[in-house]
Regions:
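A short acidic, often aromatic-flanked loop/helix-cap motif at beta-alpha or helix-coil junctions
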Residues: 21-22, 125-129, 148-151, 168-169
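Feature captures the catalytic cores and cofactor-binding loops of soluble hydro-lyases/lyases
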Residues: 27, 34-141, 146
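C-terminal binding/interaction regions
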Residues: 148-151, 160-179
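Conserved small/polar residues in nucleotide/adenosyl-binding loops
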Residues: 181-183
């Protein structure tokens, strides 16, 4: 399986300014029974999106019609906790192609890169600026250019460069699914 090449993405973003989001919050363990990558998006942030009676929690940002997009902007230390490839699958299956944060757990970062989700680590100051701008104007476009390794807030022409392993960058640019490569 391969995924779409990631070269340049311009999209609105969904802000999730919560720090220390772990993989069990991203996809609760009770939904990990499947081994195929499809269907996990329905349970992304399940316990935050729905109450115990399976009713939508209107207050959660993914349930707020003001916000949409292919970019998730998350608080510091996103993807911590147990190694759970399903968390990256859920993010991709939901429709996100990029997650922006000021820090990622290493295993989570690699799982994302392996399945076509670009984790972009930026400075805490720039992350706060993105949160502020997107909160004030949800239709703000964010541009993530992988070739240039640059994130930009399009409407105000503010940007910051980010680092990425050259091998992983090449795989994202070409749409290679690294989770299928076994040595």
């Amino acid at each position: 399986m391969s995924y779409d090449k990631f070269i340049d993405l311009t999209s609105t973003a969904i802000p999730l300014p919560i720090e220390n989001i772990d993989t069990d919050q991203i996809i609760p363990a009770r939904f990990l029974k499947a081994t195929k990558r499809v269907g996990f998006g329905d349970n992304l942030f399940r316990d935050w999106r729905y109450d115990e009676n399976n009713n939508i929690k209107e207050s959660f940002v993914l349930n707020n019609n003001s916000y949409s997009g292919k970019i998730l902007v998350a608080g510091k230390n996103f993807g911590s906790g147990s190694s759970r490839e399903h968390a990256a699958w859920a993010i991709y299956d939901y429709g996100f192609r990029c997650v922006i944060s000021s820090f990622f757990a290493d295993i989570f970062r690699n799982n994302c890169l392996n399945v076509g989700v670009l984790p972009v680590q930026i400075s805490p100051i720039f992350l706060e600026k993105i949160f502020q701008v997107v909160h004030e104007k949800p239709q703000t476009n964010i541009n993530v250019n992988l070739k240039k390794q640059k994130v930009s807030i399009v409407d105000i022409e503010l940007s910051e460069n980010f680092e990425i392993n050259e091998y992983k960058k090449n795989n994202m640019l070409n749409g290679f699914d690294l989770s299928l490569i076994h040595i």
